[in-house]
Amino acid sequence: MCKLSYMGQGKYFHLFLIVLLVFGSIGWTQFTEVNINLDMRRLSEGDRQLFNFMEEDIKQYYLNTQFSPDVSDLELIIDIHLVIESVSQGGSQTTVNAQAILVNKEVQYDGSMKTMDQYFYAKGIQFPYSIGRKIIYTSSFDPLSSFLDYYAFMLIAAELDTWNYMMGTSFFNRAVELSDRGKDSGWDQGWDDRWKKARKIKNN
């Protein structure tokens, strides 16, 4: 009987750990819903296969990355419309050129979704890509993950500024610093515009 009781307690303890991990991971990230539309109309059928997992990879990147331990209750909802303009081959490397629109949204009392005040149009997006390539959060510059980080910082900063005056400054600074690294990298396309954008919004 004691053995059965112990086994039952162990079962519930494991269940508790699973629940804690699932809900704990939700609690410490800044984005709670990410909707992605990948537009590949300009690509051939063969090139489209390269992006079979990209929508889900970007979604999971935003949902599971902790962009800051200091702000974990933002519950941001964003829509991303990513247009893949072209895919080119250079040796063993595949280069993707794209543009994107990112907007934040909010659930209304009636359950409908309303587009809020943040609207970012990104052009000159360029990054290397391959099938099965995972998007990993890193402090080093990476053309794809750094692009996603930049707009995460911008969206978080803009949201915090609605809470309190200049509350988002540290995140605008992170966007500026990331843009500096982008400008000095071998994948500098578009980063000068992002640098100017972050500084302009920060100083307004």
Which residue stretches match the model-derived regions?
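N-terminal secretory signal peptides that target proteins for export/translocation
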Residues: 1-11
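Sec/Tat signal peptide C-region and signal peptidase I cleavage site
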Residues: 25-29
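Bacterial N-terminal signal peptides
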Residues: 14-24
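Start-of-domain marker
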Residues: 30-97, 108-110
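Acidic/His-rich structured neighborhood in mature extracellular/periplasmic domains
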Residues: 97-203
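N-terminal, helix-rich and Lys/Arg-enriched segments in bacterial and organellar proteins
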Residues: 12-13, 48
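Alpha-helical structural motif
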Residues: 14-15, 54, 148
